[in-house]
Amino acid sequence: MPKEKYEPPDPRRMYTIMSSEEAANGKKSHWAELEISGKVRSLSSSLWSLTHLTALHLSDNSLSCIPSDIAKLHNLVYLDLSHNQIQSLPAELGNMVSLRELHLNYNQLRVLPFELGKLFQLQTLSLKGNPLTQDILNLCLEPDGTRRLLNYLLDNLSGTAKRISTEQPPPRSWIMLQEPDRTRPTALFSVMCYNVLCDKYATRQLYGYCPSWALNWDYRKKAIIQEILSCNADIISLQEVETEQYYSFFLVELKERGYNGFFSPKSRARTMSEQERKHVDGCAIFFKTEKFTLVQKHTVEFNQLAMANSEGSEAMLNRVMTKDNIGVAVLLELRKELIEMSSGKPHLGTEKQLILVANAHMHWDPEYSDVKLVQTMMFLSEVKNIIDKASRSLKSSVLGECGTIPLVLCADLNSLPDSGVVEYLSTGGVETNHKDFKELRYNESLTNFSCNGKNGMTNGRITHGFKLKSAYENGLMPYTNYTFDFKGIIDYIFYSKPQLNTLAILGPLDHHWLVENNISGCPHPLIPSDHFSLFAQLELLLPFLPQVNGIHLPGRR
């Protein structure tokens, strides 16, 4: 996986002694390395409190064992234990995931703890002069021997299979946010948003802390479908679904349980052979057929929109058009059974109740904040067009007192809560000179994506016509993406006000469980994706039933 540039310690280990004058003037000492020598037989426990150390030189001593407390030195990148009499290593050494160099030459090691395989950032592992088994020595002699040995140790980590059955993460809590509206007819339904981590992206280069067998799709897919089914959501939005897996796995599994679905792969699929196309990922939406009827389905290709609306903008052509992300949307009609179940009273009248569910996966690269923002504007613009056209064509039967078709937007936006993307969605617009545009010239082309119509820019601000609210607000979920290098919120469920409310959400995975089990990133043998799913129960406010003597009669509860 990507590593920060590593500078090994200077072997000369030069030092300076602070003068009394410097000390009197308030100069602070700073030392990040420590060398202990002189045939030392044991180490003081106070050593483990020096957590600021980045390098520890303990070679040429008479140490026979290393205490497990060494793992408290979590900032160490360099550890030299060569030329001692060490016979065994503590398993806790595997928790020192910042290590880049570990020197164990000329000791008395016969075995290595499998936990050393967790040192995925290690670049040098020196083992010369130890009576190790031949299979370990053979791995060390191979090209890229350190990496091969670490992979072997991690894949054979003792007890991993047993821990899967005994140390499952505790259930995520169900957080109630408000009670249903008892004063009017409503329909309740649940929505899941989940990036399942496509097989081709689940590599040891990206996720070096995860055993290869736990990255394998045949292993991960069982836990993924188990999580999806355990939520029993009425609507499921998935990102990073491989084309072949959509048709051979997800659709098969979910159809058996009463779902129908719609899927589109990323735009690159159109230029590929049939065999290559199978491995292109995309976005999928599933819905329970007992509660919804499919009216329309749509695919939004951002590179096609960029080409058609570039208006001479080089940034649009060179940065946005070259990315093949997509979004999908389905227009669903609520079945009368869902309305009856939720309102407690038969649905009267002939009007249809529609809802639009949209799902998208925006570009990943943090350096392309402008592209993510433009892609989001494109998607909202197309979603608005879909809703407007559906409203016009069915206006005699779909528009109640709320005035428009409600929207549920699920997405891996690859954008943090303080980004221009989330500002645009949650506040209704964004300035054309927003920092996320990186001072690139998008202005003329951006007006085409204003959801208030072409040239709908107001005072240098691009706006959209929705009132959107996030189901997960106020830190309810500290992170939706959890890897070693990045932990943050990038997945969202938005819904349109005033037609929709959030009643409850599925809370975060227990942080203490992650810490206690030294889980530095996901996926993990117990967590099948690098994303955590979002799951919310929503309430749709329905039009009042026909008036009797001028009084609205709400459904019975």
Swiss-Prot record:
What are the binding positions for Mg(2+) 1 in this chain? 240
According to its UniProt entry, the protein's GO biological process terms are: miRNA-mediated gene silencing by mRNA destabilization; nuclear-transcribed mRNA catabolic process, no-go decay; nuclear-transcribed mRNA poly(A) tail shortening; positive regulation of cell population proliferation; positive regulation of cytoplasmic mRNA processing body assembly; regulation of translation
Where is the catalytic site? 412 (proton donor/acceptor)
User: Sorted alphabetically, which keywords does the UniProt record give?
Assistant: Activator, Cytoplasm, Exonuclease, Hydrolase, Leucine-rich repeat, Magnesium, Metal-binding, Nuclease, Nucleus, Repeat, RNA-binding, RNA-mediated gene silencing, Transcription, Transcription regulation, Translation regulation
Specify whether Oxidoreductase is a keyword of the entry.
no
Question: Which domain of life does the UniProt lineage start with?
Answer: Eukaryota
Where is it localised? Cytoplasm; Nucleus
Query: Which sites bind substrate?
Result: 240, 276, 361, 366, 414, 481, 486
Q: Where is this region: Nuclease domain?
A: 153-557
- Where it mainly occurs, coarsely classed, is cytoplasm
Q: Can you state which reaction this protein catalyses?
A: Exonucleolytic cleavage of poly(A) to 5'-AMP
Per the entry, the cofactor note is:
Binds 2 magnesium ions, but the ions interact each with only 1 or 2 residues.
Q: Identify the PROSITE patterns for this entry.
A: LRR (PS51450)
Please state what class of enzyme this protein is: hydrolase
- Which Pfam families does the UniProt record give? Exo_endo_phos, LRR_8
Q: Where does Mg(2+) 2 bind?
A: 412
Enzyme Commission number(s) = 3.1.13.4
* Names of the cofactor(s): Mg(2+)
Q: Which cysteines bridge via disulfide bonds?
A: none
**Has keyword Metal-binding?**
yes
Gene Ontology MF, one: RNA exonuclease activity
Q: What GO cellular component entries does it have?
A: CCR4-NOT complex; cytosol; nucleus
Q: Which family does it belong to?
A: Belongs to the CCR4/nocturin family.
Spell out the PANTHER family in the cross-references: CARBON CATABOLITE REPRESSOR PROTEIN 4, CCR4-NOT TRANSCRIPTION COMPLEX SUBUNIT 6
Protein name as it appears in the record:
CCR4-NOT transcription complex subunit 6
